[in-house]
C-alpha cells in the first residue's frame, strides 16, 4: 500500500506534468490578444469580436478618421467625428459624439479598434471614455490589419468608393452581376466575376478562371479589391470567397450597383 507521502509525490508529479503540457499547447491565433501591460481597458480577440458582431452584443466603434473608416472598415462597425482642435498626429474621436451614439448609456458595452498593435487611437479614446465615466469599454487592439490577415472582409462606404476610384489607380473593382447586366454597362474598368460562378471551396469555378486569366491580381495579393453587386448580399458573398483565396485587402460596397452608379455620375 502506498504511503501518504508517496501518494502526495505522485499527485505533485502529475500536476507538474499537466502544467508543462498545458503551457506547451499551441495557441490559437483567433483567440490571441496583444496582451499589453499598463492598459486600463481589456482586449478582445478576433474570435470574440466575431461573436460580438454576430450577436450584436456591443457597439463596435472604429476609432479612425471618417475617410479611413469609409474606405475600409469591419462590417457592423460605426464611426463618429473627431474631437475638435486635436492635431491629426494625436487623433481621437469625440466622446460627446460617442455619447449621442449610445444615447447617454455609459454602461453600454463598447469595443474600439483602429490600425492595429502600433495604433494609439483606440487607446486614447478608451482613456477619454473612462475619464467620462464609461464603465464597459474594451479594445480589439489587433485592429483592422489583423482582422484582414485572418480572413476578415471589410466594407466600403459611398464616399470611400468615390475617393478610391478617384485616387487609387491600382485598385481592382469586381462587378459580380450576371453577364447581361455587366455588358449593358459597368463602373469604369470593373472586371467581371459573376456571383453565380463563385462556388464553395478553394480554386474552383469562376474564381479559379479569374486567377488564370488575369481578372484577379495574382502577382500582388495586397492589391485593393472592391466588390460591387446587384445586392449587398451578392457582393459580400464574393468578397468573402476572395478572402479565402489569400487576397487580404478586400472590401464590398454597402449599397447596390445602381446606387454606386448614380452617385458616381459627373
Region annotations inferred by a language model:
Residues 59, 67-68:
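Primarily extracytoplasmic ectodomains and periplasmic/lumenal surface modules that are beta-strand-rich
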Amino acid at each position: 500500500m502506498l504511503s501518504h507521502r508517496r501518494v502526495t509525490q505522485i499527485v505533485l508529479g502529475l500536476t507538474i506534468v499537466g502544467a508543462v503540457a498545458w503551457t506547451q499547447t499551441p495557441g490559437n491565433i483567433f483567440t490571441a490578444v496583444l496582451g499589453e501591460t499598463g492598459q486600463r481597458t481589456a482586449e478582445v480577440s478576433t474570435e470574440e469580436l466575431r461573436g460580438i458582431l454576430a450577436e450584436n452584443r456591443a457597439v463596435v466603434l472604429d476609432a479612425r478618421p471618417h475617410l479611413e473608416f469609409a474606405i475600409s472598415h469591419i462590417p457592423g462597425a460605426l464611426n463618429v467625428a473627431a474631437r475638435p482642435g486635436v492635431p491629426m498626429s494625436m487623433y481621437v474621436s469625440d466622446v460627446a459624439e460617442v455619447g449621442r451614439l449610445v444615447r447617454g448609456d455609459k454602461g453600454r458595452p463598447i469595443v474600439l479598434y483602429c490600425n492595429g498593435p502600433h495604433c494609439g487611437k483606440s487607446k486614447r479614446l478608451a482613456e477619454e471614455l473612462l475619464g467620462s465615466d464609461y464603465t464597459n469599454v474594451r479594445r480589439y487592439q489587433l485592429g483592422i490589419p489583423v482582422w484582414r490577415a485572418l480572413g476578415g472582409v471589410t466594407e466600403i462606404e459611398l464616399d470611400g468608393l468615390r475617393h478610391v476610384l478617384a485616387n487609387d489607380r491600382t485598385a481592382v473593382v469586381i462587378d459580380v452581376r450576371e453577364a447581361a447586366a455587366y455588358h449593358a454597362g459597368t463602373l469604369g474598368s470593373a472586371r467581371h466575376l459573376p456571383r453565380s460562378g463563385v462556388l464553395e471551396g478553394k480554386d474552383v469555378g469562376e474564381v479559379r478562371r479569374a486567377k488564370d486569366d488575369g481578372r484577379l491580381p495574382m502577382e500582388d495579393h495586397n492589391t485593393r479589391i472592391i466588390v460591387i453587386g446587384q445586392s449587398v448580399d451578392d457582393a459580400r458573398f464574393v468578397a468573402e470567397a476572395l478572402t479565402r483565396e489569400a487576397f487580404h485587402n478586400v472590401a464590398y460596397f454597402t449599397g447596390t450597383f445602381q446606387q454606386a452608379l448614380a452617385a458616381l455620375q459627373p
